[in-house]
């Protein structure tokens, strides 16, 4: 037994490797079963793929996707969003993360994809970005803007993708997100079309540093609908904050500001809509004040804001009555007094400001005179409402400015900006006034931007760059924008300003003046005057505007009385809301509301034109806010005025990306070897040729790009995304090259170190086991004969041979059977036999499992329970109870453990007895006494003393035999023997053994390998010996070639192959130690049984003929088998079956011959002379076959180590166990199978040898040898025939007496005689 590692180590390692090996997929991803359950896609996700480009086809595609809960659709890089009016669960953090780092084509359409594209382009191209969200009121613009901000806040500043950011960046993100609930509360309201309609425009610019981290933000406010503060139409509401405050104010706020429910105030109750489904005013109020805290508003500022809101609510409850003179009087002075308390002014000042108007004459003799003019109730109510609107409008502006101050305080120098525009959508009501005109005007400007950038500018650029292009017709709404904002000819805003300037005192007169001036606009096809109304044909539809009150709203100037009232207040916050005062000495007309909205819209357009836009076009599916209704006609109208059909046409015919040659080269020069080297720009030509070289080297199809005069164009976004991916991977590839070189260097250095360590460990490997082995020698102290395998150089004390400390199935089973805790180690485990007493009969050894832990010795036994083996713990012997251990003086394997208990002393038979004793003494600290004697005494069960004697019996070659208290055993090695020195290492082969050639060609060797002729015995071969070693006759490799007839070859009439004699070697026996026979003819006592079976007995030599040389006495007693040749012949080393091309029954290992004593003398054998008719020796005995069995039933394995069987399988029996389990072998696989499943197969009787053919005259032509076909299908290797060598039987079974070898000898003699006659002179 040669052991170099702990038992089970290789198996465990192999098992782990096998489990860790990934499946081979050859680049094909495993199919996901969940794909069969995915929701089928409805319509097309990108409408540029529509087969028909019509408004109806676009509408039908949007309808399909809306019905399938897919609200987002692309037109190229434009996102179309249909308001679902419900939560679809598509804005979770998981979905948000899935869009990070993905281009538009990798994921389904989503608002997150637009946000990711804007953020990526900002970082990649260092250009400002903006997201323009347009659509009519209630289409979902505010929600889209919130999701854009949510995504940017989530991904910005986190370059690692782990979500970790610095505290400053995190603060900026929180503040940016906090602006949404705060501005929604103060700037949104319920309308007939939208429950959360934005009643103001907002452009949020988020500033980023060079690393993409947010460093600040700015909000620009556009045209708050302040008229909503003082009045709404039926079923609409005031701004959300009024309902939130009146419903959810704290007790302190209610007590301090007299707050009541919304039904108590005229400004909130007159529209008869206090609650809205889906809106929680209490939760929104808490969110608004939490946003104030995040942004940084102090408690005093928050209380001042609540005071102003309460002032507005109480001002709405001030009513007027007409006195006898027709002037206005206060109907409820108490309310006015409470308003004065809130404004912190004198109550009389409030009364005068609301009921009187101070006028100062500007002309005439009384120039500069001041008059107090009383107001009628209508005029007083207008002054009251003007004060309320002014307070709320200025409060909203203060909130925006306060937010900007908080965000800018954290900002540094911004490198890039992303803007998000959330503005009111296009509105058409029954009564449309000045507010709707301004809102629709801003939407016309946004539509003009869309047309300029996506339709007009793109086509103009193609013409300027001389790009092949087919023009697309579209509607340009510039004519509508000029109708509203132009000065020459004057537009609607200019006409309003002129009317206010000429008739400023009377609003009705100003309205009439305005209608007269609109006659100059009748030449515009998009304008039509109709009495007191006028119609404007907007891009989104025709809108009829009411002129009444429009000039007054356009004037938008506070009375001097109101400003004086504010100045008299002691509230600094209120005074701060009105910082601007008109200059009384200035003759310049103050700007009107129309002027301000026009200036703001043009400034917004300038900002948007300086950034790279991304578009989101929102669509409202129905007017009832239903999640299931889809109004085909209403959506079709929106599709038409949004110009989606024209957008699709331009997108399909245009180019997705264009940029100057310099920027393209700057961006992508890394992708061409001609333009870059190691990251440096090396192109010597101009930018245009460099751009062309990049496109050519990256393999882009020629129809995918064009070069203009100053710019390069890429047609499809897929191409651009591919270039971006290649660029992103460039630095990764460079880094991987450096890493690869570094790893190769480190690997070489580490491998060198490991080689040194390996060499050191190899010299020290198993040192502890060797020391334990030497300790075992010391325990025996030269008093016990040794077995040969106990002394081999590689014999080490491994201990746990059953792998209880490992993970094998058998080890786990034994550990469970012994009830061992998982943390208790096993120092020794092996199979053993226990002497079991039988009533009235002699005791017999019975198989057991022998285990030893640091605290006890365990003896386990296996029984059959219901025809199934079951292992149980038979006995546990604590180490402290073992008084002494008894061993004999001979080489047997018996051990006596004297424990002194009623159960008796166990008498064990174990192959590793010395190792067991060494471990036992090691665990007990040497306290256990070791007795070595020729007769051992032990106690049987019941404290009956017994003896066991040991004697030598040379007829027992291997092992020992117990019978009647006597153990018979052969002679062993001397007691003073020591372990053999380590064997010298064999030189390594030039290539791994797995790569050696295993073909049927001859094996190249310095020494020839004998060629074996096929016979019945040789073709079958011997079964492999236990332990995996093939028998000697298994090396007899059969051949598939038949014997050629005599006429087939001229040089060799018989056609037989000659076996060349091995070259002689001077001195020594010439045999390796593993092939030398012992000096005596008796088998060696130390030879294992499986080696004795592997070497067949030498055949009996017949009487030599007179012509042949007689063998010497030394030859006959050398003990070397005749088939191995003479002792003076140097034999070839063992050859594996793979090298010989053997059949499947042969093993791949070389066959070791029995070792011999070193004292065997070398005997010379003379060469065999050719004879005429030499009688051949009888055939050697056929090698013993293992009995064969047939499986009667199917057997499925339950545990590792069992061999599965199918009915009819043929197996060979290797070992029988008494527990009903047999060790069998099927092919090259062996394992345990139940004996009841097997049936013995009767072997056929051996065929008698064929008699020799009759002798023929010498002159006759020799007959050809009968051809015999080998039973094997494998062609053996062969050596060239030697005409001077005598035919001999090299291996047993290669030739029959008087058979092929006799024919060869006779033919050779005939040829020699014929040659002599030919040379005799006549």
UniProtKB/Swiss-Prot annotation:
Locations listed in the record: Cytoplasm, Cytoskeleton, Actin patch
Domain IQ positions: 732-752, 753-778
GO cellular component: actin cortical patch; cell tip; myosin complex; plasma membrane
Keywords: Actin-binding, ATP-binding, Cytoplasm, Cytoskeleton, Hydrolase, Motor protein, Myosin, Nucleotide-binding, Phosphoprotein, Repeat, SH3 domain
PTM description: Phosphorylation of the TEDS site (Ser-369) is required for the polarization of the actin cytoskeleton. Phosphorylation probably activates the myosin-I ATPase activity.
CDD domains noted in UniProt: MYSc_Myo1, SH3_Myosin-I_fungi
Broad class of where this protein is predominantly found: cytoplasm
Region feature (Disordered): 966-1090, 1137-1162, 1246-1300
GO BP of this protein: actin cortical patch localization; actin filament organization; endocytosis
Compositional bias ranges of the Polar residues kind: 1078-1087, 1137-1148, 1269-1280
SMART domains in the cross-refs: MYSc, SH3
Binding site for ATP: 135-142
Chain ranges of the TH1 domain: 786-980
Record region (Actin-binding): 417-499
GO-annotated molecular function: actin filament binding; ATP binding; hydrolase activity; microfilament motor activity
Domain Myosin motor positions: 42-728
The keyword Repeat belongs to this UniProt entry's keyword annotation: yes
Record family assignment: Belongs to the TRAFAC class myosin-kinesin ATPase superfamily. Myosin family.
Role noted for this protein: Type-I myosin implicated in the organization of the actin cytoskeleton. Required for proper actin cytoskeleton polarization. At the cell cortex, assembles in patch-like structures together with proteins from the actin-polymerizing machinery and promotes actin assembly. Functions as actin nucleation-promoting factor (NPF) for the Arp2/3 complex.
Record note on domains: The myosin motor domain displays actin-stimulated ATPase activity and generates a mechanochemical force.
Protein name: Myosin-1
Native source organism of the sequence: Malassezia globosa (strain ATCC MYA-4612 / CBS 7966)
